[in-house]
Amino acid sequence: DTRPPGFTPFR
């Protein structure tokens, strides 16, 4: 994954 730390799929 190339997502930043603390990224949440929830809006």
From Swiss-Prot:
Specify whether Secreted is a keyword of the entry: yes
Gene Ontology cellular component terms for the protein in this record? extracellular space
Q: Which GO terms describe its molecular function?
A: hormone activity; toxin activity
Keyword Secreted (UniProt): yes
- Record keywords: Bradykinin receptor impairing toxin, G-protein coupled receptor impairing toxin, Secreted, Toxin
Entry coiled-coil feature ranges: none
- What biological-process GO terms show up in the record? defense response; negative regulation of blood pressure; positive regulation of smooth muscle contraction
Q: In which tissues is it expressed?
A: Expressed by the venom gland.
**InterPro entries cross-referenced by the UniProt entry:** Bradykinin
State its location(s): Secreted
UniProt miscellaneous comment? Cyphokinin is hydrolyzed by ACE by only 27.3% (compared to bradykinin).
- Give the similarity note: Belongs to the bradykinin-related peptide family.
Q: What is this protein called?
A: Cyphokinin
Task: Give the source species.
Answer: Cyphononyx dorsalis (Spider wasp)
What lineage, starting at the top, does this entry show? Eukaryota, Metazoa, Ecdysozoa, Arthropoda, Hexapoda
